[in-house]
């Protein structure tokens, strides 16, 4: 594969893994690893899974460009971003690429080449690809400004993370990308979708459950807690920024519909309801630092 030229900015990648399908995860990693200067693999899996050995054996190439981080605990994503940010600061990386284990590039080389070219012109932008499963806007430009992103595929200049103070670990997983996007824009930077570059991103395992055949992600009670807590904190932290339509969408999807899914379709109803409402309470009482 063609390597990036010396004139390009120095690029650090970060991918988070949690009990992945190893062939799929390693295949996805090899689509972008050759075009990075270094990749941090943040392993949230239990140690007994022995993921490090299995993944590195499967990669076979470019393993000298990998830093592995994992101690058997699941720290989610925000601490991983901050680890990568501090590493980038200390080792003079210009850009940080964020990746999920399930995301698959069609042509990463062309994407990161355009990112590097645009970064050399202006350092005030965060870049992301077009994600068919998530993006609903009408494409009108090859570089189109947008207000949100998902973490996977997004490239953030280290200087922008310096300005906003990295990821807010009040959002370990859920609403983290929303919080980052809002803080980036509040600081005066833009989010630019490079729309001709496609990233296929898995949105989770949706199942039809219950007597009413309702579609649900069937999240664990702990994940339901995280979702209901984090979106309340997001609203309290950014209510001056969020539009009424954004607030309505969040309320409808993460609270009203989720409550109905628990009641009408999902198992362990009492445990799920307990964690769902505990998340709401903890989100309301969480101390906000703006």
Q: Which residues fall in each region the model found?
A:
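Short, well-formed alpha-helical segments that are part of the catalytic scaffolds
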Residues: 17-34
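A conserved acidic beta->alpha catalytic loop
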Residues: 43-53, 73, 103-104
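Glycine-rich, basic loop-to-helix element that forms the pyrophosphate-binding segment
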Residues: 71-88
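Short beta-strand-to-loop acidic/aromatic patch adjacent to the donor-nucleotide binding site
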Residues: 93-104
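Conserved donor NDP-sugar-binding/catalytic core segment of glycosyltransferases
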Residues: 104-139
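Conserved nucleotide-sugar donor-binding
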Residues: 152-165
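A short, conserved alpha-helix in the catalytic core of glycosyltransferases
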Residues: 160, 170-203
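Non-catalytic, C-terminal membrane-associated alpha-helical segments of glycosyltransferases
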Residues: 239-290
């Amino acid at each position: 594969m063609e390597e990036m030229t010396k004139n390009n900015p120095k690029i650090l990648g970060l991918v988070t893994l949690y009990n992945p399908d190893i062939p799929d995860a390693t295949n996805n990693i090899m689509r972008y690893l050759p075009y990075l200067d270094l990749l941090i693999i943040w392993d949230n899996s239990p140690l007994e899974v022995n993921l490090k050995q299995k993944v590195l054996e499967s990669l076979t190439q470019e393993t000298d460009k990998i830093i592995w981080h994992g101690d058997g605990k699941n720290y989610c994503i925000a601490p991983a971003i901050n680890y990568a940010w501090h590493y980038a600061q200390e080792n003079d990386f210009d850009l940080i690429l964020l990746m999920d284990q399930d995301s698959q590039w069609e042509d990463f080389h062309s994407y990161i080449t355009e990112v590097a070219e645009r970064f050399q012109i202006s350092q005030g932008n965060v870049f992301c690809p077009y994600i068919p499963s998530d993006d609903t806007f009408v494409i009108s430009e090859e570089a189109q400004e947008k207000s949100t992103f998902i973490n996977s595929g997004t490239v953030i200049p280290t200087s922008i993370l310096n300005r906003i103070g990295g990821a807010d670990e009040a959002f370990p997983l859920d609403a983290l990308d929303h919080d980052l996007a809002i803080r980036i824009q509040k600081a005066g930077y833009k989010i630019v979708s490079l729309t001709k570059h496609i990233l296929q991103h898995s949105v989770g395992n949706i199942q039809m459950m219950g007597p009413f055949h309702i579609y649900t992600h069937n999240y664990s009670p702990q994940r339901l807690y995280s979702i209901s807590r984090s979106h309340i904190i997001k609203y309290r932290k950014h209510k001056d920024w969020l539009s009424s339509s954004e607030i309505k969408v969040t309320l409808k999807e993460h609270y009203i519909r989720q409550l109905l899914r628990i009641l009408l379709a999902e198992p362990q109803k009492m445990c799920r309801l307990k964690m769902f409402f505990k998340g709401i309470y903890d989100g309301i009482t969480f101390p906000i630092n703006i």
